[in-house]
Amino acid sequence: MSRPPTFTPPSCARARFLSTRRGRFAVLDARPAGEPQGTVLLLPGFTGSKEDFIALLEPFTEAGYRAVAVDGRGQFETEGPDTQEAYAQSELASDVLAQAEAIGTPVHLLGHSLGGQIARAAVLLDRSPFVSLTLMSSGPAQVSPVQRERVKLLSDALVTMTMEQVWQAMRAMDPPEETPVDGADLQRRWLRTSAAQLIATGRQLTVEPDRVAELAAVQPLPKHVVSGEQDDTWPVPLLDAMAERLGARRTVVGGAQHSPNTDRPQETATALTDFWDGGH
């Protein structure tokens, strides 16, 4: 679970709803002082939310980019159905296309972890809205065996327990890491996340096929693979190989693990804006 440094957005960002042809999505919309030189659409990972990108928003706007971080359907402040079918990857990818359409300008697409696999699916449906694609800590196929087991344990618990009961069980087994975030914010996010969404997307993470060759064939589209120097969800050598197969730029953020966006935000933002500036 990503732990943002705060749930309070910086002054450059406004919390609002993005209205699309597929419904309303809660977003943090950060804008630079002048005319943006580009717009970025940010997709969070499994159990995450738009707040996972909070520490990147100010550096992005300072570099001249508008950034729109979104809660996907069933994530935190975006409502979603109670049926697992509503969270099929094709549905979530279609949501991304609708979000890009509503933003109204071509976007640099970035997905973290699960968000990267949804971003990939969106590009494979229709690459036309996207200027570039960044996959952050998001691998070529299913997650590692250890993570598959963790996802199964969580999904089994969600079938028989309430979200509050699961939260308390997780905290008992895995106390929160030291963080400036008030644990109440993390709990509030968890309780507002759809259990159906977690079960459906968790399953996707455990069975996702390797679609790297399909993605590599999408040209011209600059691609960027970003990760920390350690990752137990998709091992770093696997991400290295994926980047090579994609012909993508590769960035390893020193001192970061599965969430460079929260572990080392300044270094991560610098690598991203350099890529978007044209340093492909």
Regions found by a protein language model. Give the residues of each.
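Alpha/beta-hydrolase fold catalytic core
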Residues: 1-40, 62-65, 131, 173, ...
